[in-house]
Amino acid sequence: MQPKQRILNAPVYQPGKPIDDVKREFGLTEVIKLASNENPFGSSPKAKAAISEQLDNLALYPDGASLNLRWDLADFLGVKPSQLFFGNGSDEILLMISRAFLSEGTNAVMATQTFSQYRSNGIIEGADLIEVPLKDGVHDLEAMAAAINEQTKVVWVCNPNNPSGTIVTTSELEAFMKKTPKDVLVVLDEAYYEYVVDPEYPQTVPMLAEYPNLIILRTFSKIYGLAALRIGYGIASEELISSLEHVREPFNTGTLGQVAARAALKDQEFVKSCRDRNREGMKQFTDSFDEWGLSYYPSQTNFILVDLKMDSDEVFKKLLSQGIIVRSGNALGFPGFQRITIGTKEQNDKILSVLKEIVTGALK
């Protein structure tokens, strides 16, 4: 009994190492996880209160159309409710887009060093992948546009990019969209949208009126701090959203996630506080890296990719032994680098103290 061969060829996603595993492995009582770009400040108290009010309704199926969340989010974004599409995290939307548009004989264009699930979903659907290297850690949109051919169905653009944290600018994206054929779907994955402070970052929702072949993906897993509840969403033309509904599973988002997302959306003070504290934390890292003479990519996210010029897996293991979980650059296509989530001030102080010992050779 064997599944399809191409499924076996698809890489299995490797999440950040679980905290409990590290505690058991190293006999530690305290571990900080700075590996999965989660919000170290948690989630809005309003979201937690909304969840508690639904605990007597767990026997009931959720609203399959996410109607209340749909209306709230449409009002917040200034779009029609019919322009929204919900998934069990934006990961599921990536899967559904791939299922709807990719097949044998087609291809997708993507960056070489970007979010791994674009590649995995393409392989599963039997599509070819055209990978374009990053340019100074940024999507090379000019080269990606040139790579599009008659078999191209989807172009994946992660903005800000994971794992480099870099952005493509408004002018770069507009030039790219003008070059892209109207029958090629451009997927803008904006999972870290709310963290961005760079004024050159594109505001893409208004672009939907001009580009019906554009879909924007965002999530409640990052700055909203609801990663455990898996609520992602897409914004696109009504026609495109309608076509994706054909591949959406029934009841794919849960009641607790829907009510928490509605409450979190209404607490923009919490979002602003998290964004501000994230930039303060980012400065802790960049100031230290500058002092130590280390190179890093300018990040508009809640993580930073730094070149320690050492074996990535060895540094990863040294940090683990000290109760700190990060992501080795070897797993991300950046040997010698580590990707580090920005934590609380105390968490940042801890990892920077250990990194200094590693960089200076004090920690063997």
UniProtKB/Swiss-Prot annotation:
Homodimer. GO terms for biological process: L-histidine biosynthetic process. Its cofactor is pyridoxal 5'-phosphate. The keyword Amino-acid biosynthesis applies. HAMAP family: HisC_aminotrans_2. Signal peptide: none annotated. InterPro entries: Aminotransferase_I/II_large, HisP_aminotrans, HistidinolP_aminotransfase, PyrdxlP-dep_Trfase, PyrdxlP-dep_Trfase_major, PyrdxlP-dep_Trfase_small. This is Histidinol-phosphate aminotransferase. SUPFAM superfamilies: PLP-dependent transferases (SSF53383). Belongs to the class-II pyridoxal-phosphate-dependent aminotransferase family. Histidinol-phosphate aminotransferase subfamily. The keyword Nuclease does not apply. One of its GO terms (molecular function) is pyridoxal phosphate binding. Keywords: Amino-acid biosynthesis, Aminotransferase, Histidine biosynthesis, Pyridoxal phosphate, Transferase. The modification N6-(pyridoxal phosphate)lysine is found at residue 222. PANTHER family: HISTIDINOL-PHOSPHATE AMINOTRANSFERASE (PTHR43643:SF3), HISTIDINOL-PHOSPHATE AMINOTRANSFERASE 2 (PTHR43643). Pathway: Amino-acid biosynthesis; L-histidine biosynthesis; L-histidine from 5-phospho-alpha-D-ribose 1-diphosphate: step 7/9. It comes from Brevibacillus brevis (strain 47 / JCM 6285 / NBRC 100599). Its EC number is 2.6.1.9.
